[in-house]
């Protein structure tokens, strides 16, 4: 008999054993990287709300928001109950040729909540799949007669071959092949888009662009499109019959203070919206692309395409995933998650502004909305010179390595000294992200601000030196 681990066995594995299994069967380098941080040397016993309890009994305040997944916090009781009810009823998961009441209801709920005629939904499993499904829909809408798709230079739409080629930030430094016909415009620059659209014409003088993708707020860089840009983009796409896609995979379900970020601008409606992450309530791997009815019906409302075979996945619309999303959406609406995000912002924004003013040599800028903010740290000559001295030259081949190291030193200190779990983005200027779940209480936000203040008071040189000496030098 092969020596297989059971679920019970997993729950009794030590940190050392888990590291060993990762080295043998997952990725040895991942162990080297993650053990640079304190949380890479611990295992989690449980998680609830915004708190993580480790095996050693230490409680950690989670201010990552699950990188967009945990608007509802860890293990929301209503979501757990919905999943348990589905399981106890022994409901059917796979609805391929049976109709699913859950898919039907979920599609209805999205249509009720979204503006205009965003009425038609499809439910893949990940954000990247939703983006690719949306792009396919746009291409099919034009019958394959147009060949160009446009994305911004600042963009993150996924890591599959298709969605990866529509992403402006290359996190690995290795270039994979992608879909043909991708054009690039400057984020937030309407004239850049207009110029590109004007250049991309067929021999008949018609537009050759089938879709334009944009993130109204880029959660990976904390850049934001202006209302003027988004409305101008909508006007241009309408005039040229180009399908306009808004990617709100991270920023949806109340995170920035409105149900979706674009909804702060009355009357603004994309042709297709993508969503995922907190759409699954922190327990379900589900996404959606939601299309305006005329766009969807022209592409797929016929017997040949009725099952969307060109874009469907094995697990699309899976029973328990759809049930979880239904409950997640209802919780977000009934508990008014946009208002919760605004309440968090009323504490967080002035608190971060005060810290930035108090430590001008440490904090360069703070940007954000609702419960999603980026703290950009100074990377002046003195700090970069210190990084160069502390770190072996071979490790600086990554052009962003120095900035990552600076932010990592703050992430590590917050965890080590105060039991606060944070992260930094791998794109742009690698800001420290402050992105609590929307169930965070005011006193928890205040506690975070107090701990960030105490951490930054030490100064970047001290934080950097400590981080490198404690963790990095032992590995390199």
What are these regions (language model features)?
Residues 2-476:
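Conserved N-terminal phosphate-binding loop of PLP-dependent enzymes in the Aspartate aminotransferase
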């Amino acid at each position: 008999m092969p020596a297989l681990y059971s679920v019970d066995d997993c729950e009794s594995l030590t940190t050392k054993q888990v590291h060993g299994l990762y080295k043998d069967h997952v990725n040895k380098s991942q162990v080297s990287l993650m053990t640079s941080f304190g949380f890479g040397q611990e295992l989690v016993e449980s998680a609830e709300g915004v708190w993580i309890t480790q095996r050693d009994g230490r409680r950690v305040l989670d201010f990552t928001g699950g990188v967009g997944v945990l608007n509802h916090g860890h293990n929301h009781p209503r979501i757990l109950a919905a999943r348990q009810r589905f399981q106890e009823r022994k409901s059917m998961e796979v609805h391929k040729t049976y109709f699913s009441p859950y898919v039907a209801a979920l599609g209805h709920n999205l249509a009720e909540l979204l503006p205009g005629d965003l009425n038609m939904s499809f439910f893949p499993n990940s954000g990247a799949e939703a983006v690719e499904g949306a792009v396919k829909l746009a291409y099919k809408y034009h019958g394959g007669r147009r060949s160009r798709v446009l994305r911004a230079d600042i963009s993150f739409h996924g890591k599959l071959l298709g969605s990866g080629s529509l992403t402006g930030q290359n996190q690995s430094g290795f270039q994979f092949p992608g879909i043909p016909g991708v054009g690039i415009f400057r984020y937030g620059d309407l004239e850049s888009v207009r110029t590109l659209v004007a250049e991309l014409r067929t021999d008949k003088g018609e537009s050759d662009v089938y879709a334009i993708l944009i993130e109204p707020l880029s959660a990976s860089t904390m850049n934001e499109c202006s209302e003027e840009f988004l409305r101008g983009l909508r006007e241009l796409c309408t005039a040229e019959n180009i399908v306009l896609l808004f990617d709100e995979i991270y920023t949806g379900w109340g995170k920035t203070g409105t149900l979706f970020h674009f909804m702060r601008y009355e009357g603004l409606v994309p042709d297709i919206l993508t969503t995922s992450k907190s759409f699954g309530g922190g327990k379900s791997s589900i996404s959606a692309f939601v299309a305006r009815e005329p766009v969807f019906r022209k592409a797929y409302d016929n017997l040949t395409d009725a099952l969307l075979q060109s874009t469907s996945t094995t697990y699309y619309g899976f029973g328990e995933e759809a049930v979880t999303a239904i409950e997640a959406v209802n919780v977000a609406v009934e508990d008014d998650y946009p208002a919760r995000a605004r309440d968090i912002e009323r504490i967080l924004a002035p608190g971060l502004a005060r810290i930035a003013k108090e430590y001008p040599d440490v904090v360069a800028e703070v940007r954000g909305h609702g419960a999603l903010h980026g703290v950009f740290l100074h990377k002046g000559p003195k700090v970069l010179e210190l990084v160069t001295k502390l770190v072996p030259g071979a490790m600086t081949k990554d052009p962003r390595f120095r900035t990552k190291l600076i932010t990592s030193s703050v992430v590590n200190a917050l965890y080590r000294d105060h039991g606060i779990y944070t992260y930094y983005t791998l794109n742009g200027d690698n800001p420290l992200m402050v992105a609590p779940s929307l169930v965070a209480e005011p006193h928890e936000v205040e506690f975070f601000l107090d701990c960030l203040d105490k951490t930054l008071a030490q100064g970047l040189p001290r934080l950097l030196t400590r981080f490198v000496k404690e963790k990095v030098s032992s590995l390199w």
